[in-house]
Swiss-Prot record:
GO biological process: lipid A biosynthetic process
InterPro entries for this protein: Hexapep, LpxD, Trimer_LpxA-like_sf, UDP_GlcNAc_AcTrfase_non-rep
Active site as annotated: 229 (proton acceptor)
Reactions listed under catalytic activity: a UDP-3-O-[(3R)-3-hydroxyacyl]-alpha-D-glucosamine + a (3R)-hydroxyacyl-[ACP] = a UDP-2-N,3-O-bis[(3R)-3-hydroxyacyl]-alpha-D-glucosamine + holo-[ACP] + H(+)
Signal peptide feature range: none
Protein known as: UDP-3-O-acylglucosamine N-acyltransferase
UniProt function note: Catalyzes the N-acylation of UDP-3-O-acylglucosamine using 3-hydroxyacyl-ACP as the acyl donor. Is involved in the biosynthesis of lipid A, a phosphorylated glycolipid that anchors the lipopolysaccharide to the outer membrane of the cell.
GO cellular component: membrane
Subunit structure comment from the entry: Homotrimer.
Organism from which the protein derives: Campylobacter concisus (strain 13826)
Family: Belongs to the transferase hexapeptide repeat family. LpxD subfamily.
EC number assigned by the record: 2.3.1.191
Gene3D superfamilies assigned to the protein according to its UniProt record, in alphabetical order: Hexapeptide repeat proteins, MurE/MurF, N-terminal domain
Family matches, as CDD domains: LbH_LpxD
Length: 317
């Protein structure tokens, strides 16, 4: 689609070459044939280093757009991006292509296998599972009943996916109009699981908007956990039941998230950190320490002192 057509669809103005745009992408990864966006000062510093062919920006950020990149100026770049994401969304079903199922793999009855699926040696796929188009599953995996693996997702070797878990569903992302309507952002990324990963029953892992939601080797995730879009979990993490990680959370290696704990979006937790049950991570946390509480979260030893002070206060009063 030409920039002139895009501008009409999102009520934007531009001057410069009327480029053909083939996809949407992030500021960091967009190329000359792709369109990106920036909707605030937080990410404005990345505009000058982006390789995007064109960018959606507000008038206030126009001076930051480098030469050679076409600026589409609009009131709400995030909303414009959401509108365009539907146009550039991948199709639900691909053209039929043969799949590659290892002879030693076991496929039980009532399994749906899409186009161009690969299933490795000695992997077992139990009844009722759904394997979307272009899914890759490594060797020696066990895919339990009614597991859903959506298009383009990658499962490593020796993985266990327990019943009813969902890998690669759309993330929870919306832009908002002035009249209160919520406009869906379509997700074109995927989910990548490393080797020896276990995903508990009824856990959901959302696909990335552009790139991959990443679960590294040896990470174990309990039942009823929600992993948001674009999260990155390092090697050997332990995620206990009812934990929720908001989008773009980054966990280092061997991080432990206790039961019913959670994180705000775009936070980083360092290697070997431990978050106690019901802990709420609202800011970046250094590794190698134990944390508890929510507002504010603090080191476990400080949390004990804080609770003791509260008890002493009420005893005095």
């Amino acid at each position: 689609m030409k920039l002139s057509e895009i501008a009409l669809k999102v009520d934007a103005t531009f001057s410069g070459e009327d480029l053909e745009i083939f996809a949407l992408n992030s500021l960091k990864n967009a190329n000359k044939a792709e369109l990106t966006y920036c909707d605030g000062e937080k990410n404005a510093k990345f505009i000058s280093t982006s390789n995007a062919g064109a960018i959606l920006v507000t008038k206030s950020l126009l001076d930051l757009v480098p030469a050679g990149m076409v600026a589409l100026v609009c009131d709400n770049p995030h909303l414009a991006f959401a509108i365009l994401s539907k146009i550039y969304a991948k199709p639900l079903f691909c053209e039929p292509k043969p799949s590659n199922i290892a002879q030693s793999a076991t496929i039980m009855p009532n399994v749906y296998i899409g186009s161009n699926v690969s299933v490795g040696e000695n992997t077992i796929v139990m009844a009722g599972a759904f394997l979307g188009d272009n899914v890759t599953i490594g060797k020696n995996c066990i895919i339990h009943p009614n597991v859903v693996i959506y298009n383009d997702c990658v499962i490593g070797n020796e993985c266990h996916l327990l019943a009813n878990c969902v890998i690669g569903s759309d993330g929870f992302g919306y832009a908002h109009t002035k009249t209160g309507e919520h406009v869906k952002i379509y997700h074109n990324g995927n989910v990548v699981l490393g080797d020896f990963v276990e995903i508990g029953a009824c856990t959901t892992i959302d696909r990335g908007v552009f790139e991959s939601t990443m679960i590294a080797n040896y990470t174990k995730i309990d039942n009823l956990v929600q992993i948001g879009h674009n999260c990155e979990l390092g090697n050997g993490c332990l995620i206990v039941s009812q934990t929720g990680l908001a989008g773009s959370t980054v966990l280092g290696r061997n991080v432990v998230m206790g039961g019913q704990s959670g994180s705000a979006g775009h936070v980083k937790v360092g290697d070997f950190a431990q978050i106690a049950a019901r802990g709420g991570v609202s800011k970046d946390l250094p590794g190698g320490k134990k944390y508890a509480g929510a507002y504010p979260i603090m080191e476990l030893s400080e949390q004990f002192k804080f609770q003791a002070k509260i008890l002493r206060f009420f005893k005095k009063n």
